[in-house]
Design a protein with these regions (language model features):
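A short, aliphatic-rich alpha-helical micro-motif
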Residues: 16, 60-61, 98
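Conserved class I S-adenosyl-L-methionine
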Residues: 1-7
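Conserved beta-strand segments of alpha/beta enzyme cores
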Residues: 21, 45-47, 127
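Conserved SAM-binding loop of SAM-dependent methyltransferases across substrates and taxa
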Residues: 8-20
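S-adenosyl-L-methionine
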Residues: 25-65
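Residues at the starts of beta-strands that form the adenosine-phosphate
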Residues: 20-21, 103
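Mobile, glycine- and charge-enriched loop segments
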Residues: 1, 60-68, 72
Length: 182
């Protein structure tokens, strides 16, 4: 598991537990030191790399899963609303990401147009997850895999409710609104 945009390490701490090898990459040295300390306190063995996502990606070995939560602000601190304006630019990195990982998890701003993001990333997007809390959209997560697909699974979650649209063939789709169990 490789997190190319480590940040505070919260997503990394949660998601990496299912993997034997865990690599956290972050360009900010202060965040790396904080994450290293927190991982030690949590008893989470991880390799912490202080560096740019783009450079690490070029030299890294194959990974089962690569996670990215690109920065959503430009060099002036203004919010960005297009995936191509995020840092790192995932659209530019996509060919190398697909070469280096079986699955790419991409966490994006709820302000982004998910349909445009899917179009921009091409037909490797297999799943779209829209996560809400109390009817307020919090995150957009795209699951990208090698091999193209024409049928994207769309899942919307809000507290204990889950709505899923799974297309099959042409224009038909199956829809269901279910309460999550447990």
């Amino acid at each position: 598991f490789v997190d190319l945009t480590g940040g505070f390490g919260v997503d990394f701490s949660f998601m990496s537990c299912s993997f034997m090898k865990r690599i956290y990459v972050e360009r900010n040295s202060g965040l790396c030191e904080m994450a290293r300390h927190n991982f030690q306190v949590l008893g989470l063995e991880a390799e912490v790399v202080n560096g740019e996502a783009e450079e690490y990606l070029k030299k890294m070995d194959h990974a089962d899963v690569v996670f990215l939560d690109p920065a959503r602000r430009d060099e002036h601190g203004c919010r960005t609303y297009d995936i191509k304006d995020c840092t790192p630019n995932v659209i530019d990195l996509m060919p190398l990401l697909l070469e280096k990982a079986d699955t790419i998890l991409l966490k994006l701003s709820p302000m982004l147009d998910w349909q445009k993001a899917v179009r921009d990333l091409g037909n490797h997007v297999h799943e779209v997850h829209i996560v809400s809390v109390d009817n307020e959209c919090k995150e957009l997560v795209l699951v990208i895999r090698k091999g193209s697909t024409e049928q994207i699974s769309l899942t919307c979650m809000n507290n204990d409710q889950k709505f899923r649209v799974v297309p099959w063939g042409g224009t038909k789709c199956s829809m269901g609104w279910n309460k999550r169990e447990g």
